[in-house]
């Protein structure tokens, strides 16, 4: 069981407990071994096969459980495998209520479960609590949300979601994808969620040099099911990736803070140019701002931008130099993309349109570069696109 957090999150990120290396290495060693020798048949050791357990992975999981305010944490090969392991806790024909503005890969996996296992999935605008409540049934098995959502950056009241779910579907698993905020800015388990998961590829690692997923829970029963699924499917993170993730986590506080401060300036800058910008807290008087800061400690560093013209958006994306055209977010470098053509292209256009995922939507993921350089890059892109303020 992980230790309770004793210090501020910035300190806890750096100090890793549970390293039992016999040589007292200050950095957790990479146990790059598929199997482990046993002392004898009668007394098996703590580890036998890396698919089931590995010393490097064990230290990482204890560290993540502490940071995510969980009793148990598990690391998987990528973020989608983390969600897959969670969904495998549900039986065939389960009823799922999920946000309608989800990461495209999550939407694709839910659609697969609809076809393959008879899942009944209702996608709703989770920022509309009345619509969310109407979608719930007494036999709802799982609720899946993001806040902020990806890519529109809509805010849903994660506290109210818990209260409504417990009153209408008390046995449903409450699951939140916290990738946008990371443990530095939000701890959903503190608000009553059964499971929180993240793509470790993003802020947790921070350098786009590994693929990984994290699942955290306070429930022994859920942990037992999740571990069985990971072990049975062979979905656990490999030792080298565990080492990289342990290293990346140590600087996450600094990275998130710098990227977040840059993002605040970039959001204000783009808004001043007449663009529609969705970014948490950009409008201090908006109701969504008060809701957001009831569960988050900062806005993060991802925003959605609407130009009103697809060709203008394409020119902006193609013209930037420092903002690299790429999917993903949460690394030290700034990225830019058009979700309708990239991360959410697997969703049919008519469905995207119904969910407000317009073709002109640009997702900007701000990194830790000099903010004046970033603004100059965007200024030039806007000029090249001949964007005119309405």
UniProtKB/Swiss-Prot annotation:
Primary location: cytoplasm
Disulphide bonds in the chain: none
Catalysed reactions, as listed in the record: L,L-cystathionine + H2O = L-homocysteine + pyruvate + NH4(+); an S-substituted L-cysteine + H2O = a thiol + pyruvate + NH4(+)
EC nos: 4.4.1.13
N6-(pyridoxal phosphate)lysine PTM sites in chain numbering: 202
GO MF, one example: cysteine-S-conjugate beta-lyase activity
Metabolic or biological pathway: Amino-acid biosynthesis; L-methionine biosynthesis via de novo pathway; L-homocysteine from L-cystathionine: step 1/1
GO biological process: 'de novo' L-methionine biosynthetic process; transsulfuration
GO cellular component: cytoplasm; nucleus; peroxisome
Cofactor(s) the protein requires to work: pyridoxal 5'-phosphate
Enzyme class: lyase
Family under the similarity heading: Belongs to the trans-sulfuration enzymes family.
Record's protein name: Cystathionine beta-lyase
Protein species of origin: Schizosaccharomyces pombe (strain 972 / ATCC 24843)
